[in-house]
Amino acid sequence: LNDLLMNLKGMAPLGIPVNKIGGQARNLPRLIDEAFHSDNHMLVFPAGLCSRKIDGKIQDLPWGKAFISKSRQTGRDIIPIHFEGENSKRFYNIASLQKLLGLKFNFAMLLLPDEMYRSTGRKYKVTFGKPVSIASLDKSKSDFEWAQQIRNSVYEL
């Protein structure tokens, strides 16, 4: 969870703090390693940011390979999940304006707590895909290529 969401009541115990504004805490690699080695279920957002409106459609930015690499290191299988929902037009407009102006700071992130509270009471569709055995992700593709393949399968759910 980003540093803003971690400060909301009840959110801190649910996530690993990822600092999107300043430097990362020294213990972040250890916290991630502990999470991957635990028996707890966890959600990973491979794009690192909320989805954006691209060509008129809400979609993720390119996914990173870290979730594949860590799953491979720890023997954790992957369950693809598609969460159908969207933030406000205001959120996407600010994200687009930020990109258009070439601003590095993620201004849209500042809206996430408000976006979360505005969605209270809404119903969302969550679809779970078939588990992907980490053993099935052989060396025929790089971890990055496997990440993109799983991303594509999530969008087909």
Predicted features and spans:
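Catalytic core of membrane glycerolipid acyltransferases/transacylases, capturing the structured
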Residues: L1-G23
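Non-catalytic C-terminal accessory region of glycerolipid acyltransferases
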Residues: R26-L157
